[in-house]
Amino acid sequence: MAPYHIRKYQDSDHRSVVDLFRRGMEEHIPATFRHMLLLPRTLLLLLGVPLTLFLASGSWLLVLLSILTLFLSLWFLAKYTWEKHVMNCLHTDMADITRTYMSSHSSCFWVAESRGQTVGMVAARPVKDPLLQKKQLQLLHLSVSLQHRREGLGKAMVRTVLQFAQMQGFSEVVLSTSMLQYAALALYQGMGFQKTGETFYTYLSRLRKSPMINLKYSLTSPWEGDL
């Protein structure tokens, strides 16, 4: 296990942070593809369209081309989902990380370094909702490089956010993560985050039945002592 050090973000980290974030999101493309492939409506298309074409034309070549087209379309949709998410983040809060996360005492962005390389990242900022009865901090952009998984780095990054929230007087830490991010969900729930609901942010996510899972960690809960 290589040693790592968690510290606050610096402007010189921007390129390595973006690369880590992009690679982390691209890892979810195969899982998204498999999820869409196994949906009942997809299986129906994979059976129905080629069969209809064969009965109409008698051409096995046309059947193979139709199956290939369906597979490529599913892969494109899976790839598009995560590429769109990356571009959206890079043009909003991650366009200027220093301004978004480092210009206020109530928000922060951390990186994990190992042997001079950026191997982890996580961010946090307050939830701005005047209707909230509790002061909430939102955890965002948790990512750990593939080579440093299963070393406890993900948990250490989350604990960093929880400790920061506690010091800043927040009552809860909240986050949203895709149901397709299986490892992240297991990590959060294993650390005491509780599911509070599901949200479909796009028509495509509703179509493929892959909601965002909303989670909450109460800093007044029994788990607080584990920080």
Swiss-Prot record:
InterPro entries assigned: Acyl_CoA_acyltransferase (IPR016181), GNAT_dom (IPR000182), NAT_camello-type (IPR050769)
Classification via CDD domains: NAT_SF
SUPFAM superfamilies cross-referenced by the UniProt entry: Acyl-CoA N-acyltransferases (Nat)
Start and end residues of each N-acetyltransferase domain: 61-220
The keyword Membrane belongs to this UniProt entry's keyword annotation: yes
MF annotations from Gene Ontology: histone H4 acetyltransferase activity
Membrane topology: Multi-pass membrane protein
Transmembrane regions listed in the UniProt entry: 36-56, 58-78
Location of the protein in the cell: Membrane
Reaction equation(s) it catalyzes: L-lysyl-[protein] + acetyl-CoA = N(6)-acetyl-L-lysyl-[protein] + CoA + H(+)
Transmembrane as UniProt keyword: yes
UniProt cross-references to Pfam families, sorted A to Z: Acetyltransf_1 (PF00583)
Top EC class, one word: transferase
PROSITE patterns to which the protein is assigned, alphabetical: GNAT (PS51186)
EC number: 2.3.1.48
GO cellular component: nuclear membrane; nucleus
Superkingdom, natural source: Eukaryota
Keywords, ordered alphabetically: Acyltransferase, Membrane, Transferase, Transmembrane, Transmembrane helix
Family note: Belongs to the camello family.
Role noted for this protein: Has histone acetyltransferase activity in vitro, with specificity for histone H4.
Protein name: N-acetyltransferase family 8 member 7
